[in-house]
């Protein structure tokens, strides 16, 4: 009985949907987190009767066919790269990107990763790093006697060194754009890597045309909408229950047939 197998694919799809929603809710307070959405496509169809072929008398064309779908499958889990809410922190090394762009982060193996989480700090060498200690690209070194650190909307990092009256430029933040942000691969720890689907990064200066700008002492919160996630959770739960009901009904029908054959 095909209904059993079809409903099973529906339950499996809704299980995936529930897991994606659960992960969104779990990361509702994660800096720079981008909510995900499960997307589904129908499976193959079994043709019971072809459309567009001559009828039995060969006098007319059959206008409609009979194609029975065999279920559903998960086609993608897409990250939605919309702007998250801004959170004021008062920390001079916290930076939020407003608009398009990704911070460039140097991974342990020397490769470049990308993040929207601008919760930066200084390491023992004075280099600007992420909360996990990865260097920001390009490298920006902040002397121990630096005061009044300022990061402009264009990414220029300046500070007064020691008792100097004038500001000294310490470096320039750059950000990367991608042709297809949905093609970036999430790695955890607020990091993404480029893939052939995302295209190569195009690096530029904040506030240039087609690039967002940066805001000091702010962080970008997650773009998870709690109300929407709870609504989607209820919808997924109901769909799961209905597929379960189909399996129960198909099993009862098969049971009736088997009893009548005795």
From Swiss-Prot:
Protein name in UniProt: Flagellar basal-body rod protein FlgG
Self-association state and partner proteins as the record states: The basal body constitutes a major portion of the flagellar organelle and consists of four rings (L,P,S, and M) mounted on a central rod. The rod consists of about 26 subunits of FlgG in the distal portion, and FlgB, FlgC and FlgF are thought to build up the proximal portion of the rod with about 6 subunits each.
Subcellular location: Bacterial flagellum basal body
Organism: Agrobacterium fabrum (strain C58 / ATCC 33970)
Family named by the database record: Belongs to the flagella basal body rod proteins family.
Keyword Repressor listed: no
UniProt GO cellular component terms: bacterial-type flagellum basal body; bacterial-type flagellum basal body, distal rod
NCBIfam families (alphabetical): FlgEFG_subfam (TIGR03506), flgG_G_neg (TIGR02488)
The organism's taxonomic lineage, starting at the top: Bacteria, Pseudomonadati, Pseudomonadota, Alphaproteobacteria, Hyphomicrobiales
InterPro entries in the cross-refs: Flag_bb_rod_N (IPR001444), Flagellar_basal_body_rod_CS (IPR019776), Flagellar_FlgE/F/G (IPR020013), Flg_bb/hook_C_dom (IPR010930), FlgE/F/G-like (IPR037925), FlgG_G_neg (IPR012834), LlgE_F_G-like_D1 (IPR053967)
Disulfide bonds: none
GO biological-process terms attached to the record: bacterial-type flagellum-dependent swarming motility
Gene behind this protein: flgG
């Amino acid at each position: 009985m095909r209904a059993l197998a079809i409903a099973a694919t529906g339950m499996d799809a809704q299980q995936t949907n529930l897991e994606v929603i659960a992960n969104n809710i779990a990361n509702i307070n994660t800096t720079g987190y981008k909510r995900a959405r499960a997307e589904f496509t129908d499976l193959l169809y079994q043709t019971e009767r072809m459309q567009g072929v001559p009828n039995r008398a060969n006098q007319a064309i059959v206008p409609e066919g009979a194609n029975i779908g065999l279920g559903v499958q998960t086609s993608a889990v897409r990250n939605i790269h919309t702007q998250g809410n801004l959170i004021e922190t008062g920390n001079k090394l916290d930076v939020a990107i407003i608009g398009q762009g990704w911070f460039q982060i140097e991974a342990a193996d020397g490769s470049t990763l990308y993040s929207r989480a601008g919760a930066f700090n200084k390491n023992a060498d004075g280099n600007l790093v992420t909360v996990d200690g990865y260097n920001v690209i390009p490298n920006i070194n902040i002397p121990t006697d630096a005061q009044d650190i300022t990061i402009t909307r264009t990414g220029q990092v300046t500070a007064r060194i020691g008792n100097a009256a004038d500001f000294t430029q310490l470096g320039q933040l750059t950000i990367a754009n991608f042709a297809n942000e949905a093609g970036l691969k999430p790695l955890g720890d607020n990091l993404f890597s480029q893939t052939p689907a995302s295209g190569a990064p195009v690096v530029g200066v904040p506030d240039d045309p087609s690039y967002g700008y940066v805001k000091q002492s702010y962080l970008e919160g997650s773009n998870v909408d709690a109300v929407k996630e709870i609504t989607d959770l209820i919808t997924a739960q109901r769909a799961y229950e209905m597929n379960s009901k189909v399996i129960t009904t198909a099993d009862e029908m098969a049971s009736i047939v088997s009893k009548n054959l005795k």
